[in-house]
């Protein structure tokens, strides 16, 4: 092979390897992105909620938190629609009525059975002595 052909072959192989690795990385990133749907989107029926776990995000409605023996239920809203969430487990420390949460789980008979609750926090950090009391 001539030197020119070897160089061309090297460049082509390098682009193929680089392109393949970019496709693999982007595919893995796409499968790990954690979007969430609003209660309005879920209740509109435009999302297939029966197949896999989905994430629903919204604000916990004040006064809706109920604790049973080993279950917790509450309603989340996006200020248009609301969904009842049922959860079994320990709630995160930042969870409270009126706070924003993301629940991961499945819709079953009109209510959302969560297997994970993530509490969203305020983006403004304030040390303890500066927080409102």
From Swiss-Prot:
Membrane topology: Single-pass type II membrane protein
Chief location category: membrane
GO BP term, pick one: cytochrome complex assembly
Keyword vocabulary terms for this entry: Cell inner membrane, Cell membrane, Cytochrome c-type biogenesis, Heme, Iron, Membrane, Metal-binding, Signal-anchor, Transmembrane, Transmembrane helix
Subcellular location(s) per record: Cell inner membrane
Pfam families in the cross-refs: CcmE
Database matches in HAMAP family: CcmE
Family: Belongs to the CcmE/CycJ family.
Name under which the protein is recorded: Cytochrome c-type biogenesis protein CcmE
Naturally occurring in which organism (per UniProt): Ehrlichia canis (strain Jake)
Lineage: Bacteria, Pseudomonadati, Pseudomonadota, Alphaproteobacteria, Rickettsiales
């Amino acid at each position: 092979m001539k030197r020119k052909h070897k160089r061309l072959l090297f460049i082509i192989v390098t682009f193929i390897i680089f392109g393949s690795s970019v496709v693999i990385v982007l595919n893995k990133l796409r499968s790990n992105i954690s979007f969430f749907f609003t209660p309005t989107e879920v209740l509109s029926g435009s999302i297939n909620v029966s197949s896999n776990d989905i994430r629903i995000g919204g604000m916990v409605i004040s006064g809706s938190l109920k604790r049973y023996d080993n279950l917790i239920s509450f309603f989340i809203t996006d200020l248009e629609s609301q969904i009842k969430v049922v959860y079994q487990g320990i709630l995160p420390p930042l969870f409270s009525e009126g706070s924003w949460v993301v629940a991961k789980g499945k819709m079953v008979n009109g209510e959302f059975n969560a297997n994970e609750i993530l509490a969203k926090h305020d983006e403004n950090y304030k040390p303890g002595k500066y927080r409102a009391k």
